[in-house]
């Protein structure tokens, strides 16, 4: 877990400046992880349940690998951290490490958008960023299925953490104006809450920054005066515009709607 924001320190965990720094650092991580992913073909087979034969499982190869990875991660306390959200909560095991004692920072909530994140990533993001290698999927004995889903899982886990950081953003905004938000929450006015938390100028800055990072990180300046990016820059920007930003706001709104519950 990136430790730029100390979740054991409430004064930092809910400081919007520190949260913003964390989100910007995650932009770097996500961009590099996507660049790593596009080394491999789309390999659609790994997303089809039962297409790769797995003993005692009908899951897709991605889902099976992700589920097994989360089992291992849970043993080393990953999902005790409040900024981590499992894709397969039923797979988690008791950690072998003693628990960290986190202070109560967030209001109790049950928000987990990982199903939406995974569906958008596999259905929309991957087809738009993966290169056409000029061949069909050649099967598990010829394609790098293991490396493919390993790269996918790294992307998914960071995207999940980035999007669910909306809870910290929402709590920070609520603390700044508890009376104003309480009124909207009691009225059940999700649209007004969405308007209150939205800053179009900030969203535009994010998209411009993502475009610059995607192009910069995916080009070799030594190749030519105008090197070709290793990744579809427009597709990365679209992922933020159509998925990361909207789902982060959905997390914020859902969190605020639960903020006054017992």
UniProtKB/Swiss-Prot annotation:
Show the catalytic activity. chorismate = prephenate
Provide the top EC class: isomerase
Q: Which SUPFAM superfamilies match?
A: Chorismate mutase II
InterPro entries this protein is in? Chorismate_II_sf (IPR036263), Chorismate_mutase_AroQ_euk (IPR008238), CM_AroQ_sf_eucaryotic (IPR037039), CM_II_prokaryot (IPR002701)
Keyword Transmembrane helix: yes or no?
no
- Source domain of life: Eukaryota
Q: Which residues form a coiled coil?
A: none
Q: How is its activity regulated?
A: Contrary to classical chorismate mutases, is not subject to allosteric regulation by tryptophan or tyrosine. Also not regulated by phenylalanine.
Q: How does this protein assemble?
A: Homodimer.
Stated name of the protein: Chorismate mutase
Q: What is the gene name?
A: CMU
